[in-house]
Amino acid sequence: MRFLILVLAGSIGIYGVNLPKIPKLSDLVNPFQQFKLKDILSTLTALDTPDIAADSAGVSLPKHEYTDRLSSISDLNRSKRDLLFQGDIHLSFEHLSNIVREQLDHSRTKRTAFRNAMYPKTIWLPNVPFELHGSLSAKSRSSLVAAMAFWEKHTCVAFKKRTSEKVYLLMSGQEEGCWSTVGRDEAQGAQILNIGTGCEMFGITSHEIAHALGLFHEQSRYDRDNYVQIVKSRIAQTNFYDFAVVGKKNMETYGQKYDIGSVMHYRPTEFSLDGGNSIIAKDVNMQNTMGQFRGPSFIDVAKINRHYNCEKNCKNKITCLNGGYQHPKNCKICVCPPGYGGSDCKGIEASSPAKCTGVLVAGETQRKFTANIKPNKNAKGIRKCNYHIEAPPGKRIVIIVDSVIGNCVQGCYEEGVELKMYEDKTVTGARFCCKLQKPQTLISQGNTVPLMLVAGKAQAFVQLRYSTVDGPQNRSPKDGNATSIGVNPFLLEKYQDNSIDSEAIRKEYHIQSDNVNQEDFETLVRSEFIDENTADI
């Protein structure tokens, strides 16, 4: 990684001098062919996607006043939407034809990385040749360097300044918007990755490079309808094309679970006609996890490592628990999911500052936990408090989130709290960063819940209650979606008979939150429950 940065820093002055003229996106796409395929795919997607009305009770989620003013990638690419697949992907006619053909065959079965019959020719081996074009702004160049360094550090992928390679990544800022190809394509030669004005943040450049390495969007997975619902009435019919599913012949998930917190996932308002949610999480507690721009998630990185066969670097295997795996560049250590740490990923991830950590033991008696990371304009990097809420074997954990202070942004990737309620700890958890209109009730699948309070320079605060409940640990809806108790009954099939109703839990704890405003409710909570665990950083 250090070599990469030094090479780039020393080469800034010469980039763009002798580069060939870059064709425009409109030169690379045959409009007649593209529009014909787009119409077919839009029709197929409309027919194949379950419907839900924009005004149904299932879509009436709380509306937040988001503090971020960042445009979505599809908005940044508004002028080029007709030429791009799913808002920011340039596909060759042949590649797009294969996706349409597979949809026509209705062959949706398990397989988000681009993998077809040409694999492994569709991945970059032994390295990724690249050029940084002189049209890139200083901010875009710096962000691309950081994104390449990230992928180099966390995977076995290596980036190399192009010499004479005919197939390479040509990173440009010549046009508006942010877009890329998917995987390596010999037929294209110079594969353009465009980072225009407004696309300079790390979350976007790492997203576009992930496309170039082979990742499709997360919501285009074959199984996405088990986890999210598309609100078709909020999407123009011509944009149904952008919500198409990519089938197994062109995509591989490598056994990784669907991750709403993936940097490759659409924002909840993507392509929305009225600014409302066009994508609804079937587990309503996961809605604010969708659309983060912090950077690649644990599963995003794991998929690239699998896609490039990085595990082959480690001949001597070590034990990594909770979904962790050997680091492809240091086989003596484990890469652990967020919230976990230690030599084998069995322990708690190290906190910063170190004093805000520990195990919170859940029992039948309800306990309250409060954590507060104070604002600090001089803070450098991420401040993070990590806890594990643990219950005895055979028990599950009920958590009621009463109050949150954070930076209310889509994806809650700045200040906020994350709770991992699923049995699979590799999946991004339920995030909260906006003011709650009423307490949020969740129930775990297992007997451990990692709790992560994250802040930059601003404040992050959470107050919640937790206790145990009897029941089988692997409770899940019949459609296969793994969820916590915060499930929207209008979107899911009925739970199995051993399920627990969230309203019943609220009544059990005498919480009449619907009859009081948030401020009065917080006063009520503070007066009736004793703080047993408090962290003030």
From Swiss-Prot:
It comes from the Eukaryota. Glycans are attached at residues 77, 481. Its EC number is 3.4.24.-. Residues 17-111 form a propeptide. The keyword Signal applies. Binds 1 zinc ion per subunit. It is found in: Secreted. InterPro entries: Astacin-like_dom, CUB_dom, EGF-like_dom, MetalloPept_cat_dom_sf, Peptidase_M12A, Peptidase_Metallo, Sperma_CUB_dom_sf. Disulfide bonds join 156-310, 178-199, 314-334, 336-345, 356-385, 412-433. Residues 356-471 form the CUB domain. Residues 116-311 form the Peptidase M12A domain. It is an enzyme of class 3 (hydrolase). GO terms for biological process: proteolysis. PROSITE patterns: ASTACIN, CUB, EGF_1, EGF_2, ZINC_PROTEASE. Residues 306-346 form the EGF-like domain. The active site is at residue 208. Keywords: Cleavage on pair of basic residues, Disulfide bond, EGF-like domain, Glycoprotein, Hydrolase, Metal-binding, Metalloprotease, Protease, Secreted, Signal, Zinc, Zymogen. It holds the Pfam family Astacin. Zn(2+) binds at residues 207, 211, 217. Its main location: secreted. Residues 1-16 form the signal peptide. Expressed in the hypodermis, rectum and to a lesser extent in pharyngeal muscles and intestine. This is Zinc metalloproteinase nas-23. It comes from Caenorhabditis elegans.
